[in-house]
Amino acid sequence: MKINIFYQTDIPKYLRRTGLFQTACLQALKNFRREKAEVNIVFVNEKEILRVNKTYLNHHYVTDVISFNHERPPFDMGEPWSFGDVYVCYQVARKNAPKFEHTILQEMMMYAVHGCLHLSGMDDHTPEDRAEMDRQAEKIIASVLD
């Protein structure tokens, strides 16, 4: 599986830790690795995440992360295929990091990993499910940052 990272907003260079994001996301997707599958992690600003949220989910607010699963092609065409996209709002991560006692990098990683956990089939519809996703994300991030 290949993890593509795109920075579509102004993010300080010291936070553009592509290798760390790729490693963390691969761990979150460990049960769904497909050789030719690709996942796109797209860091965006508040305006863009609002646009995506309105356009595709009919939600009229800024959020931290949005993930979209893509259907697997019905047969192997021998070419890479998109497993999913994860949109992460950098500005929300920057604002929320102090509240959760994270660095900005940790908060960005939380959102990217959270989105990948959704792609892997986890949900956060209940407080218990959300807590489990947070535990999984924290565990992955701790292992990557050690």
Predicted regions and their residues:
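An acidic/histidine-cluster motif and surrounding catalytic segment
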Residues: 1-108, 120-146
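Short active-site segment of divalent metal-dependent hydrolases/proteases
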Residues: 113, 117-121
